[in-house]
C-alpha cells in the first residue's frame, strides 16, 4: 500500500509539473506572435514605400532598354551615372508680397433686388431693364474712342465715329466744361510729333550748347537782328538760322521746324526759366544805358 501511495504521489507531481513547464512556452509563443505582427506591419510599410517610390513612371529611364547598344565600355559607364543620380528635393520659400494692381476689374456687387417700389405702384424694372448701379463718374464714349485711336496710332482708318451733341447747351455749361477739360487732357498726353528730316540736321542738344566766350562777348556789343531790318523774310530766316548754326536749304521748312523746336526746348527748360527769373530780379548797373546806345549803333543795317 505504501508503494502504491508513493507511486500515486509521483504521478500527481508529474502532472503538476507538465503545465508549469508548458506555461513559459506559451508565453514565448505570444511574444513570437507580437514580433510576427510587427514584422508584418513593417513589411507592409516597406511594400507601400516600394510601391510609392519604386513604381516606374511613364516615360522614365529604363536601363534594360539600352543594354543591347553596341557601344564601348566607357559609354556604358556613362549610362550607369543616370541610374546613380538621385535628385534633391528643395523646399522653396514662398513670400507673400501684396501689391496694388494697375487695373482693378470693375465687377459690381450682386443685385439683391431689394427695391423700394414707386409711390404710384407702377413697375420701374430697375435692375432688369435699367442698371441699378451707383452713379460713379462714367467715361464719355466719344472721348474714350479718341483715346483708343490715339494710343493705337490708327488715324488713317476710316470708321464711323459718333459726334457728341448737346441739347440746350446754354443751360448745360458743366457738360461743356467737362468736354473741354477731357479734350485738353487728351492733347496734353500726346507725345511730341516725330519728324524725319530729309537733309542732315543737328540735334537739339547740340544746338543748346553754350557759345564760345568770344561769340558771347560779341553779342554783348552787337545786338541780334530784329524784324525792322531791311531785308526779305527768306533772308531774315537765313540770317537767324546762320547765327544759331542751323543749316538751311532751298526749302526752309525743315530749318524753320528745327528753329521752333529749339525755341520750345529753351522755353520749357527749367534751367533757363530760373536764369530768366534771376535776370528779372537783378538790377542793371548805371552804365547800361551807354551800353544799349553802343549796341544800337553797332546793330545790323
Swiss-Prot record:
Main location: cytoplasm
Keyword line: Cell projection, Cilium, Cytoplasm, Cytoskeleton, Phosphoprotein
InterPro entries cross-referenced by the UniProt entry: Intraflagellar_transp_cmplxB
Feature: compositional bias, Acidic residues: 1-12, 30-52
Compartments, record wording: Cytoplasm, Cytoskeleton, Cilium basal body; Cell projection, Cilium
CC per GO annotation: centrosome; cilium; cytoplasm; intraciliary transport particle B; microtubule organizing center; motile cilium
Sequence positions bearing Phosphothreonine: 283
One Pfam match: IFT46_B_C
Origin: domain of life: Eukaryota
Biological-process GO terms, alphabetical: cilium assembly; intraciliary transport; smoothened signaling pathway
Residue ranges of the region described as Disordered: 1-66
Role this protein plays: Forms part of a complex involved in intraflagellar transport (IFT), the bi-directional movement of particles required for the assembly, maintenance and functioning of primary cilia. May play a role in chondrocyte maturation and skeletogenesis.
Xref: PANTHER family: INTRAFLAGELLAR TRANSPORT PROTEIN 46 HOMOLOG
Family the UniProt entry places it in: Belongs to the IFT46 family.
Quaternary structure note: Component of the IFT complex B, at least composed of IFT20, IFT22, IFT25, IFT27, IFT46, IFT52, TRAF3IP1/IFT54, IFT57, IFT74, IFT80, IFT81, and IFT88. Interacts with IFT57, IFT88 and DAW1. Interacts with ARL13B. Interacts with IFT56. Interacts with TTC25. Interacts with IFT70B.
Protein name, entry field: Intraflagellar transport protein 46 homolog
Organism: Rattus norvegicus (Rat)
Highest classification ranks of the organism: Eukaryota, Metazoa, Chordata, Craniata, Vertebrata
Amino acid at each position: 500500500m505504501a508503494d502504491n501511495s508513493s507511486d500515486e504521489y509521483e504521478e500527481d507531481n508529474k502532472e503538476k509539473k507538465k503545465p508549469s513547464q508548458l506555461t513559459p512556452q506559451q508565453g514565448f509563443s505570444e511574444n513570437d506572435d507580437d514580433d510576427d505582427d510587427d514584422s508584418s506591419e513593417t513589411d507592409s510599410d516597406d511594400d507601400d514605400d516600394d510601391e510609392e517610390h519604386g513604381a516606374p513612371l511613364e516615360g522614365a529611364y529604363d536601363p534594360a532598354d539600352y543594354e543591347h547598344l553596341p557601344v564601348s565600355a566607357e559609354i556604358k559607364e556613362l549610362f550607369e551615372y543616370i541610374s546613380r543620380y538621385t535628385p534633391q528635393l528643395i523646399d522653396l520659400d514662398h513670400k507673400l508680397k501684396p501689391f496694388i494692381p494697375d487695373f482693378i476689374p470693375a465687377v459690381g456687387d450682386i443685385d439683391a433686388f431689394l427695391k423700394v417700389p414707386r409711390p404710384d405702384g407702377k413697375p420701374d424694372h430697375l435692375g432688369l431693364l435699367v442698371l441699378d448701379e451707383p452713379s460713379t463718374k462714367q467715361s464719355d464714349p466719344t472721348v474714350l474712342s479718341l483715346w483708343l485711336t490715339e494710343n493705337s496710332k490708327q488715324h488713317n482708318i476710316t470708321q464711323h465715329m459718333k459726334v457728341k451733341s448737346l441739347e440746350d447747351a446754354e443751360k448745360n455749361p458743366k457738360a461743356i466744361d467737362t468736354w473741354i477739360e477731357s479734350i485738353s487732357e487728351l492733347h496734353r498726353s500726346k507725345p511730341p510729333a516725330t519728324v524725319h528730316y530729309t537733309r542732315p540736321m543737328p540735334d537739339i542738344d547740340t544746338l543748346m550748347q553754350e557759345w564760345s566766350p568770344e561769340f558771347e562777348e560779341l553779342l554783348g556789343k552787337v545786338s541780334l537782328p530784329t524784324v525792322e531790318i531791311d531785308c526779305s523774310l527768306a533772308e531774315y530766316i537765313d540770317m537767324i538760322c546762320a547765327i544759331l548754326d542751323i543749316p538751311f536749304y532751298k526749302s526752309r521748312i525743315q530749318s524753320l521746324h528745327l528753329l521752333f523746336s529749339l525755341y520750345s526746348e529753351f522755353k520749357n527748360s527749367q534751367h533757363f526759366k530760373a536764369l530768366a527769373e534771376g535776370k528779372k530780379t537783378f538790377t542793371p548797373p548805371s552804365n547800361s544805358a551807354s551800353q544799349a546806345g553802343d549796341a544800337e549803333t553797332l546793330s545790323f543795317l
